[in-house]
Each structure stands twice: as structure tokens, then as C-alpha cells.
């Protein structure tokens, strides 16, 4: 009993600490020049094989990798080649050009993606400053981060691992919330897609911190993720977006997240905003993940963990510890302490409903407040439009949310949601997450 009380006290303390995390301010003055103009002529060593990876020991050598990949020229694409960081790197002297890029133009665009393996070797990159807003002379990249665009090559080997990026600053988009051009941004990766078909790739043991601002798909670690497994990664990032914004990932398709954490606050002026993910879509699984930041949005579909989940999405043993605030006053906010909205997609399989959303042993510890007091507002789930949802062993704090039911609107069946006091919710978190 004493051990359980000690663990319960620790969980409550962690929630308080997470809510009080300092906000990392972005750089007031941008560095001068682009790192690709200062690229080295060679790496520090290695031949690019798994046994003998190219060695990167300086900022100039890292810039060489970016310049090579972005050139798209022959062997410089480094497809299926290996890289290893040999020392900590400071990028504060110049603006970083994302490693791998894509551009958009009327009638077509261009893309040069990173298609290799990068081992951070336990080292740290500091001083990252990326500004791909279209108002800049160089701002033509749709996806921004240390890596702009990655095309995964379908190997079970981690394509990025053992890397820390500390206090990075990333901008994407044109700074105009009404723009029709969409961008993706994360401190580590702007966008990642499979190179061939639906082959999965792995990203593991990566930690990032800083600030991210993007017109769309703004997130702490990765803006847009497709067919990727993330393992034991953490994002402590203040995120500002217009739509599809999340503390860890903005938009995701057919991906898996295990043991991942989002610590930063998320603010969005648009729709689909969550403490961990803006959108979880199509065959996506989340296990033992947490969102500790507060979430605030100006449009619908907002949740402490995810704004929106649709089509074969499972979230298990995961928590949302931050508060949720919707500023939408003239429309249904679809706001939930854990998930904003669960939605059914299309059709069935041989007469059986084949699309589902599952929440298993998930908990919401924050307070939900909305500018519009009626509508789809729930302690755990804002709106259920899924037609085929399973909720088992979940809870929300009914002390902080005394007027709310577990589901705000359109209940489709029996929900395993318990309204509990603060200590009981923390106990559930202790049992199911830690």
C-alpha cells in the first residue's frame, strides 16, 4: 500500500512538473547565410557501408550531406548508405537547409529525399535554425526540420536513431493562416514517406526540443508521417500551427508509436489539434505514449492527446495530462480531454464493419474548457462519429470536468469510461502507463 501511495505521489508530481515546463523562446535574430554554402569537401572518414559508415564530426560535414542529397546528382543521393555522427555539433552560425527537400509550384514540383541511414551515436545537435517560409529568398521547401523529406527504404533497421536535437527553431509556410499552400514541420523531420509501396521503417531513441511554427502539419518531432514505427522518442517542443498540429506528430498514416512522449504546449488557429497528434489515420497504432502539454485551438477537433482519429486506429495504455482549451464560439468544437473526434470512414468488408477506433486503458487528467458551452464536449472523447468504436478501461477527471460526460455527443454504444476524482485518475495512469 505504501509503495502504491509513493508511486501515486510521483505520478501527480510528474503531471505538475510537465504543466510547468518552461517555454523555449525562438531566436530573435536569425543567423546569417546558409550552411550549404559552407559545406565541407569530404566527410571525416568511412565509405558509407554498414560496417564502415561515413563519419560526420563537424557542422560543415553535416552540411555536405545536405548539399549532396539536395543536389540529386548521381552517387550524391547516398541511397542506402550509412552515416554516423562522431561529435556534438553546433549549427548556430548559419541557417540550416533541411536535409532532403521538396518544392511546390503551379503545374508541378521537385523532390530530393534522404534515403539512407543516420546514427546519431548518442551525440547532440544544437543551434538548429530552419526558416522555410516563402517570404524568404531561400524559403521554397515545403517540409522543414533537420531532415526536410525522408523516403524510407523499407528496412527493419532504424533509418534515424540515437540522436538529440536541442533547442531547435523551425519555421515553414508563408506565415499567412489563410494560405492555400500546405507545409510540414518538425524539429527532426518535416515529412517522411516510404520509398517503395508500403514498406515500413523505424526511427528510435531520438529526443528533440525547441519551437516549431508551420502553416500545416506543425509538430514537435515530425510534421507528416507515413508507414513509420517510432520507438522511445521524445519531443519537448512548443508548437504553433494553423491546422493539423500535434506535440509529437502533426498528421500520420499507417504508422506505429511505442514509448513516445510529447511534453510541449500546442497552439493552433485551425482544426485537428492534439497534445500528441493532430490526426491519427488509417491503420495507426499508439502504445504506451504520453502527452503532457496544454492544448489550445481556434477550430474544431481538439483533444488532450489527439484531435482526430479515423479508420483502424488503436490507442492503448496512453495518457493526456494537459489542459484542453477551445476558442471556437460559433461552431461545434468537438473537444475532448483525450480525443476530439473519432470518425468512421467508408464501407464494410463482406457485410461487416471494417473500420474502427479503439481506446484501451487511456486516461485524461486535464481540464476541458470551451468558448461554446454546448456541443460535442467530453471529458475523454468530444464526438463519436465512428459507428464502430471500442473504449475499454479509460477514465477522465470529473473534479476538473464536473459538468462533462465521458463522451460529448453521438454515443453509439456502451463505453468503458469512468469519471473519477483526480487521485483515482492518477492511480489509473500509474497502473496502465508507467
Predicted segments with their positions:
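Bacterial N-terminal signal peptides that target proteins for export
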Residues: 1-11
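Residues within alpha-helical transmembrane segments of multi-pass membrane proteins, especially transporters
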Residues: 11, 15-17
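C-terminal segment of classical bacterial N-terminal signal peptides
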Residues: 17-26
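Surface-exposed repetitive/solenoidal architectures
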Residues: 28-434
Amino acid at each position: 500500500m505504501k509503495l502504491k501511495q509513493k508511486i501515486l505521489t510521483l505520478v501527480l508530481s510528474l503531471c505538475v512538473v510537465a504543466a510547468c515546463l518552461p517555454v523555449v523562446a525562438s531566436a530573435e535574430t536569425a543567423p546569417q547565410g546558409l550552411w550549404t554554402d559552407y559545406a565541407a569537401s569530404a566527410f571525416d572518414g568511412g565509405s558509407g557501408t554498414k560496417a564502415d559508415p561515413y563519419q560526420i564530426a563537424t557542422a560543415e560535414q553535416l552540411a555536405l550531406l545536405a548539399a549532396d542529397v539536395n543536389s540529386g546528382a548521381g552517387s550524391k543521393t547516398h541511397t542506402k548508405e550509412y552515416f554516423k555522427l562522431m561529435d556534438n555539433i553546433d549549427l548556430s552560425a548559419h541557417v540550416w537547409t533541411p536535409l532532403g527537400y521538396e518544392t511546390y509550384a503551379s503545374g508541378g514540383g521537385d523532390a530530393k529525399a534522404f534515403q539512407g541511414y543516420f546514427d546519431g551515436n548518442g551525440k547532440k545537435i544544437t543551434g538548429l535554425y530552419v526558416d522555410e517560409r516563402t517570404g524568404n529568398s531561400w524559403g521554397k521547401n515545403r517540409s522543414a526540420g533537420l531532415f526536410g523529406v525522408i523516403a524510407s527504404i523499407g528496412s527493419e533497421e532504424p533509418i534515424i536513431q540515437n540522436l538529440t536535437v536541442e533547442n531547435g527553431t523551425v519555421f515553414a509556410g508563408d506565415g499567412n493562416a489563410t494560405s492555400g499552400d500546405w507545409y510540414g514541420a518538425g524539429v527532426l523531420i518535416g515529412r517522411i514517406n516510404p520509398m517503395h509501396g508500403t514498406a515500413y521503417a523505424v526511427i528510435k531513441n531520438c529526443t528533440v526540443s525547441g519551437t516549431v511554427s508551420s502553416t500545416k502539419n506543425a509538430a514537435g518531432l515530425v510534421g507528416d508521417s507515413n508507414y513509420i514505427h517510432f520507438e522511445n522518442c521524445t519531443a519537448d517542443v512548443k508548437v504553433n500551427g494553423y491546422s493539423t498540429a500535434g506535440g509529437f506528430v502533426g498528421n500520420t498514416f499507417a504508422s506505429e508509436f511505442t514509448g513516445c512522449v510529447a511534453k510541449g504546449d500546442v497552439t493552433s488557429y485551425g482544426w485537428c489539434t492534439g497534445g500528441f497528434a493532430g490526426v491519427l489515420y488509417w491503420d495507426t497504432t499508439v502504445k504506451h505514449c504520453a502527452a503532457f502539454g496544454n492544448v489550445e485551438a481556434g477550430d474544431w477537433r481538439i483533444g488532450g492527446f489527439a484531435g482526430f482519429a479515423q479508420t483502424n486506429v488503436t490507442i492503448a495504455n496512453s495518457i493526456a495530462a494537459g489542459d484542453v482549451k477551445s476558442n471556437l464560439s460559433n461552431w461545434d468544437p468537438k473537444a475532448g480531454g483525450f480525443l476530439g473526434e473519432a470518425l468512421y470512414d467508408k464501407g464494410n468488408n463482406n457485410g461487416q464493419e471494417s473500420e474502427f477506433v479503439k481506446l484501451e486503458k487511456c486516461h485524461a487528467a486535464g481540464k476541458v474548457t470551451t468558448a461554446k458551452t454546448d456541443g460535442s464536449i467530453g471529458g475523454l472523447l468530444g464526438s463519436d462519429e465512428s459507428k464502430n468504436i471500442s473504449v475499454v478501461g479509460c477514465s477522465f477527471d470529473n473534479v476538473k470536468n464536473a459538468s462533462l460526460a465521458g463522451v460529448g455527443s453521438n454515443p453509439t454504444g456502451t463505453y468503458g469510461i469512468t469519471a473519477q476524482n483526480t487521485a483515482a485518475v492518477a492511480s489509473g495512469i500509474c497502473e496502465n502507463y508507467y
